[in-house]
Each structure stands twice: as C-alpha cells, then as structure tokens.
Design a protein with these regions (language model features):
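Active-site-adjacent structural elements that line small-molecule/cofactor binding pockets in enzymes
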Residues: 1-315
Length: 315
C-alpha cells in the first residue's frame, strides 16, 4: 500500500504550518503530501486565513527534496485551464518533477460567491472539467499551435513554456464519490481515480465498476490507479484517540456532539489504535485500493503525522 498525507489547509494553516507538515511527512516516509484547494475556511470558525494552494506548492517545491506534492483537488471553477497548465508546469519544474495534479468539479458555492467565481450547475462544471483536462493534456504534450474549441474554453494556438519535467506529463488525479460521469472522465483523462467518503465495501463495489467502465472504453483497467481519501485519526491507546477526537471536534465547533460525529464516520475512517488502524487499512487494500490519502484534520499535531508514518507507512 502507498500512502499520502492529505491536509485540509483551509483550517487556518499558514505557509509555515504547511511547510512543517510537509517536512514531517517527508521524514515519516510518506510518498506524497497533498493539500485541499479552498479559498474559504471551514468547517469551524469562519474567517481564519486561507492560502492559495498553488502558491504554497511552489514554496514547498523548493523546501522539500523527496516527497511528491499536489492538490486534492483543484476546482475547475477557480482557474482557466491555460492558467492551470502554466502553474502546474512551473511547479513541476520547481520540484524537479514531483507533482501530482488533482482536479475536480468543485462543490462549495459559498467560497465561490465570496471570491466572485461563477458557480454553474454540476452538469456544466463537469463539462468544464472535461474540457480543462483536454486542454491540460494538449498544452503539456501537444505541439506548438495545438488548438481546442469547446463549449466553455477555446485555445486557438497553444504554446506552453516551460513544459512539465515529468514525461509524458504529471500524473492526473480525478476525484469524486464514484458517479458514472466522474468515472468516465477518469477513464478518459486520468492516471488515478480517487474515491472519497467510502467504506471499504463501497470502495470495492466502485472500483469494480470503474474497471468495467475502463474495459468498455477500451482501456486496460490496470493503467488507472485506484485510490481513496480516508479520514485518519490514530492514537497509541484509547486515551490518546479520545484526546485527538476531542481536539478535532473542538476545531470544528462541534464539541457538543461528542462521539456521535465519529461514530457515523468510523465505518469509512482509519480510526483508533495502531492495531485498529492497520486492520482498516488492510480492508481498503483488499477492496482494491492501491493508495490511501490519509485525510488529517489535526494539522497542528505533528506527532500525529509521526504516528501515522510509524503505524501505516513504515508499519
């Protein structure tokens, strides 16, 4: 099993916070450090500072050495495909070819309203995502003069410099909850499909369906990596699990909910003691998951990163 550490940077994480997390994840043996791409702070206290994902990744590219870096995921609505192509090629060069590019349709209407971004219906955003991915591939890999004319975007004569360092292109991750359209988009454009909010049982069912969609489209299912974004909270004993659970609830402004919030999520989280965490990770592996993005809601707790590395990455 391969592991990435994924943080929700909109929890008020400064650049210094994210650098500390990325370096700690690198030292702990994680393959990849991923961060969300949001412009508003949530859940919990509104108004906390949020940082731009690609500005942060550019900095991390120069201040880490081994760990891969990326977004999970960048909404199609935030950036024109030409702008995203330039950003990703630049960060790939700055990192020496350590970039993963996670993209999705976006979902949080409030942050779009707060920053003046249009937020069309999901069907339109999905169309935009398909066009964005075609343009990314074309600008990264196509010849000078490559052109595209779609419903939402036009590129009359493409030319991108620098090109990405990774050949033929940085890996693309398409994320979602396993809808038919997200699977079709992943099969057409992605190197990896990332399933969110799924139990091991649902993951097995969705991955099997994804393989069928790939075969029907004439693609070898083995060429499309299966991964899952999985909430992660681990403690050395039950007392430490309880302490970290309370810290998450406090940060989310949900202390009054007690254990109910975690009880609802435990069937799809890596949660508990080291033995419980390893057992749940094994269930995801048996479901066909090749990489787990450990979604860490404790970005101020660097010892939690150490423990996740000890128990899962190196365990």
């Amino acid at each position: 099993m391969r592991y990435a550490l994924m943080i929700e940077a909109q929890q008020g994480c400064s650049y210094a916070d994210q650098l500390a997390l990325a370096r700690r994840a690198e030292a702990a043996g994680f393959e990849t450090f991923l961060r969300s791409d949001h412009y508003d702070s949530f859940p919990g206290e509104a108004g906390r500072p949020t940082t731009d994902a690609w500005a942060v990744l550019a900095g991390l590219a120069r201040e880490t050495s081994r760990i891969r870096l990326g977004t999970l995921v960048s909404p199609v609505t935030f950036r024109h495909p030409g702008n995203l192509a330039k950003l990703t090629a630049t960060v790939d060069e700055m990192s020496g070819g350590r970039l993963d590019v996670g993209v999705g349709a976006g979902w949080n209407q409030e942050e779009h309203d707060h920053h003046g971004f249009p937020f069309p219906p999901l069907e339109v955003r999905a169309e935009m995502l398909e066009e964005q991915l075609e343009i990314l591939r074309g600008l990264w890999q196509g010849p000078d003069g490559w052109s595209f004319s779609g419903r939402h975007y036009q590129v009359p004569g493409g030319r991108l410099r620098p090109r990405p360092v990774q050949l033929p292109a940085p890996p693309i991750i398409v994320g979602g909850e396993g809808s038919p359209r997200s699977m079709r988009i992943a099969v057409r454009f992605a190197d990896e499909f990332n399933l969110s909010s799924a139990s091991p049982e649902r993951a097995a069912e969705r991955f099997a369906k994804l393989d069928t969609v790939a075969r029907d489209a004439g693609r070898d299912p083995a060429s499309l990596r299966h991964s899952a974004m999985v909430g992660a909270l681990v403690g050395r004993d039950h007392a430490e699990v309880e302490r970290r659970s309370r810290a998450v609830l406090d940060a989310f402004g949900m202390a009054e909910e007690g254990t109910a919030w975690f009880d609802e999520r435990r069937p799809r989280w890596i949660y508990g003691t080291p033995d419980e965490a390893r057992a749940m990770a094994a269930r995801f592996e048996a479901a066909g998951c090749e990489r787990i993005m450990l979604q860490d809601f404790l970005p101020w707790d660097l010892e939690h990163v150490d423990l996740l590395g000890e128990v899962l990455v190196r365990g």
